[in-house]
Amino acid sequence: MEYCLDTGDLEMVKKVADLYPIRCFSMNPSIAVNCLRGTGRTFLQNAKMIREVIGEDTPFYLEAMGDTAEEMIEDAHKIRQEIKGNTMIKIPACPQGFKAIRLDR
């Protein structure tokens, strides 16, 4: 069995990255908001730090944010520029998310 850990908790990632058979990591804004409270870090700053811990080859899924398709596309491109390595963009399954996928071909 392969596992993907969905968290924004940097300390947890540091603890489990080498202890468990974690195949990939994932972070979305709703999970990250709780993990980032009080740290002073942004979603992207935290994602960069997690990427440093897990290495560039490990799949890392990050959700693009935005109220409109255009905002989601802009955020997706920003994530790809900032977070190197095997990074994949998650798009919310909603009308604006589907529109973003269609527009950004």
Task: Please describe what each predicted stretch is.
Residues 4, 9-14, 19-22, 27-105:
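Active-site beta->alpha loop and helix N-cap motifs at the rims of alpha/beta catalytic domains
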